Amino acid sequence: MYHISAEDIYLFHQGTNFESHQFLGCHEINWKGKRGYRFAVWAPNALKVCVVGDFNNWEENSHPLEKFTDEGLWGGFIADIPPATSYKYHICSSEDTSILKADPFATQAERRPKTASVIPAANGYQWSDDQWIEQRNTYDPYSSPISIYEVHLGTWKKTLKKQFLSYRELATQLIPYVKSLGYTHIELLPINEHPFDRSWGYQITGYFAVTSRYGNPSDFKYFIDQCHQHQIGVILDWVPGHFCKDDFGLRQFDGAPLYEYRDPKKSEKKSWGTLAFDYGRPEVQSFLISNAIYWLKEFHIDGLRVDAVASMLYLNFDRYDEEEKIYNTYGGEENLEAFAFLRKLNKVVFSYIPGALMMAEDSSDLPLVTAPVNKGGLGFNYKWNMGWMNDLLSFMEKESIHRKWHHNRLTFSFMYTYSENYLLPLSHDEVVHGKKSLLDKMPGDQWQQFANLRLLYGYMYTHPGKKLVFMGGELAQYAEWKDTEELDWHLLEYPLHKGIYHYIKNLNELYQQHPELYELDHLSEGFEWIDPHNIDQSVIAFRRKANKPNQELIIICNFTPQVHFDYKIGVPESGRYKEIFNSDSVRFGGSGQINEGEHFSFPEKWHGLSQHIKIKVPPLAISVFQIEVERERLPRE
């Protein structure tokens, strides 16, 4: 019926139609010699479904749909409707109530505060990123540098009239800016349609609709296309964990729970005032997995960061009172349907897009999140390392004189860093809701705060794991993220803030030019401690290695403002060592305690290694050394 195949219908109800957006929703077709639009919607509890909109003056009964499957699919054809027309579904429920709903599969929506779906224009966008897509197919993310600039498009920068920049304006401003800083990827906070600006996109009503705040779908494709032509990947925050309760959205779509669990205990997400998807329902699986495939295929998105995974996996994620708690059939707290859904999602995504990035924002200690599904894992590429982030920020917030009492928070991450493929996040969540900006978290006077911030970033970039920094991190903002205003761009007029900007740029350059810092991120062979035990002085030293034999860097971090002279560091090879990076450089706003010239190794064991060098350890800083060449003769001490 209406060019909808029996196979598509069958697979949708089996939970295995992974491109169900191709037949559900609104699509332009030829039907019986007429040009128009086919509408199809899943509403099994409805007694009647009509399409209403601008084209029929929102008359409730003028364009009824036909129920063409026993499982509740409704469809119809309407001729001579122009593109960009607004519409909704008028649904009469089994409770004999009438409701107006936006189309769950709509690819465009009205700009808030309006809430209707919009009939899309013909898809005429011509992509120019063939070379990027081709190289993505053979891309190995594990041995490649990944440095992500996390962005909320509405508050990165605004027009002179304090309005949002459009997708096309962002393409001309944001992309060159990110490229100049040296990032490899942009990660966008959710751009699915959402009614409330200050939800940041995490409470969605239109899963297939790119938000109209910044333009239309073609404009967003242009933005992504330009990213790819500048060799920048694009990752979307994707929210399959919950959806908002607005009346026009998915909640009780046909008058009864449909996309959400029927049991309110299971569906309620109390922390956010939202509803959980019913992961055990086949049609919901088809809806969500189709949505993931839609963004990856239709918009050439390079990866998805799956939001709030722990809230999906655990039935009692935000339930603390015993009488509120629920359990699975085996008496456990795991949502077994969510486990199965995520495994299915990742298997399907990688079958469609082998080079995709699938990243789990998971705050739990569940093992095997990034292990393959056939080995009992969830099948993600990467997991956000929330433990590293929490421990490190807690450590850095301590006055330097007290850090020795919390040394384990600095080093504990290495007890588990190779148990998963990790990404190290300094995300938007850490600079909002009274948590303070990264700079404001740092203790000490102004100089120490900036030095601590440089040290924080430096330790992050030399620690195993891919990198993510939220926008504004390069400006060293004093204020936390203001989710209604643009970044504090005026700070770049001040030398210390400008120094952080240049520092981030140089860190990205160091990171990408040295495979020691990324090539073996996922293997323990890529890291070796030199000295993790200097608790009293809060100095640590370690080695980062690449695949090539003897290609390695020596990293020293000093977490106090004390300068150490003639400090011995064990090194593995005899030769000349040169400092190639120092966060205390004057050009970054530091005090200039750098190591100039070459440092010859001495044939005396130190830190369990056959050689050592003597260096100056700068205050609240990170130093990176590289062996230059082996030498024939060692000087006397």
From Swiss-Prot:
Molecular function per GO: 1,4-alpha-glucan branching enzyme activity; cation binding; hydrolase activity, hydrolyzing O-glycosyl compounds
Keyword Mitochondrion (UniProt): no
SMART domains xref list: Aamy
Catalytic site positions: D307, E361
GO cellular component, one term: cytosol
Catalytic reaction(s) noted: Transfers a segment of a (1->4)-alpha-D-glucan chain to a primary hydroxy group in a similar glucan chain
EC number(s) given by UniProt: 2.4.1.18
Pathway annotation: Glycan biosynthesis; glycogen biosynthesis
NCBIfam families: branching_enzym (TIGR01515), PRK05402.1 (NF003811), PRK12313.1 (NF008967)
UniProt family annotation: Belongs to the glycosyl hydrolase 13 family. GlgB subfamily.
Job of this protein: Catalyzes the formation of the alpha-1,6-glucosidic linkages in glycogen by scission of a 1,4-alpha-linked oligosaccharide from growing alpha-1,4-glucan chains and the subsequent attachment of the oligosaccharide to the alpha-1,6 position.
Known partners and oligomeric status: Monomer.
Protein name: 1,4-alpha-glucan branching enzyme GlgB
